[in-house]
A protein has these predicted regions:
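Catalytic binding pocket for nucleotide-activated donors in carbohydrate/polymer assembly enzymes
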Residues: 98-101, 119-129, 212-222, 237, ...
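Structural motif
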Residues: 53-56, 103, 160, 197, ...
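Active-site donor-binding acidic/aromatic loop of nucleotide-activated sugar
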Residues: 222-230
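Short beta-strand scaffold positions
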Residues: 57, 106, 244-245, 280
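C-terminal alpha-helical cap of glycosyltransferases
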Residues: 315-334
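Active-site and donor-binding regions of nucleotide-sugar-utilizing enzymes
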Residues: 1-135, 251
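Conserved catalytic-core segment of nucleotide-activated headgroup transferases in glycan assembly
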Residues: 131-216
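Short, charged/polar "capping" segments at the starts of alpha-helices
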Residues: 64-65, 111-114, 171-172, 206-213, ...
């Protein structure tokens, strides 16, 4: 903790007010270092029992995974980053600009270009698709809209809007952390005005007790709503349109499930073209955007293939197989 008050003052002189830094940074640093030390000790123990041919991470910018990748590289073990989603970040700098692994197995052409533009060698980027999205290939063949609505006790003949909540991004310095809260209210008001059936699918990272929060918000506004933190596949297949905040990759999963999306964008993030269709965090804007998609289904029918190819590459359920084969190619095996 020595010297931290001085560090805080230097930050403040540069326009970042971090008074009190010394009250929380030492404890946070200690907790991170303890976890990293534990993980690397486990990795060392594992490596003494079995030869390691490759280390694979789903991201390499947070302390634990970055440390693991650096540890492997120091030992000459090939490292692979399989991003768990696309990055829709336009603003730089951003924490995701750097990748420490030897290889990137990209989710999509968009993701491959994104990393290449930030200086990662293109010859070390392999297109595989996103393994955790393979399930959607089977979902669209086995779960119909009618079945999903029956399971979720939704009316068959009234529009269903799926609202996927998000979290305020914190990987760069341009985000507007008020958008998410404004969007929560705007979607509820739009659903009330338009008479939609509303399903609220919580972000996996939100506290589970927020399910009660969303339910109470809907009740206060007189909006019948089904709130869940699970059942994404059923929710997508039951919906006519998905509404999301910011750069969430749930819009790509919705596309794999053959459902269009309206996005309330966060500052600093964006898409090259429609879809998705964008809306400000107001009831009027959201109602207009969703209404346009509902009234013109050909907008989605005509663009779905290009959207999926751009952000998910090949929709065949084979990303896991391709990633495993690529790991076999780049690893060092005895």
């Amino acid at each position: 903790a020595h010297g931290l008050p001085g560090v805080a003052r230097r930050f403040s002189r540069n326009g970042i007010n971090l008074d009190g830094l010394d009250t929380w940074l030492p404890g946070l640093s200690l907790s991170i270092l303890t976890q990293v030390a534990h993980d690397l000790h486990c990795a060392e123990a594992f490596a003494t029992q079995l030869p390691l041919g490759c280390v694979v991470t789903h991201e390499d910018v947070t302390p634990q995974f970055k440390a693991l990748a650096l540890w492997a590289k120091a030992k000459g073990i090939p490292t692979v980053h399989i991003p768990h989603a696309n990055h829709f970040i336009k603003t730089r700098p951003d924490v995701h600009d750097k990748c420490v692994c030897d290889w990137i197995f990209a989710t999509s052409p968009w993701m491959a270009d994104w990393y290449a533009e930030r200086g990662f060698p293109r010859e070390r980027i392999k297109l595989t698709g996103c393994p955790n999205w393979d399930v959607w290939h089977e979902v669209v063949q086995t779960i119909s809209k009618e079945h999903a609505r029956a399971v979720m006790l939704l009316e068959q003949d009234r529009p269903v809007v799926l609202y996927c909540t998000s979290w305020s991004q914190s990987t760069n310095l341009v985000d507007d952390h008020t958008v998410k809260d404004r969007a929560d209210v705007a979607v509820l008001e739009a659903a009330k005005q338009a008479g939609w059936q509303l399903v609220i699918k919580m972000h996996p990272g939100e506290p589970p007790d927020w399910q009660k929060r969303y339910a109470e918000m809907a009740k206060e506004r007189g909006v019948p709503a089904l709130v869940t933190q699970s059942h994404l596949t059923l929710s997508v297949r039951a919906a006519d349109v998905l509404v999301s905040v910011g750069p969430s990759n749930v819009i790509v999963e919705a596309a794999l499930g053959d459902r269009p999306s309206v996005v309330v964008p966060l500052r600093g993030y964006g898409f090259p073209c429609e879809p998705p269709w964008l809306a400000d965090p107001t009831p009027e804007a959201i109602q207009a955007a969703v209404g346009r998609v509902l009234d013109n289904p050909q907008l989605w029918t005509e663009e779905r293939g290009r959207f999926v190819q751009r952000f998910a590459w090949v929709h065949d359920g084979g990303a896991t197989r391709r990633a495993a084969e690529a790991v076999r190619e780049v690893g060092k095996w005895q």
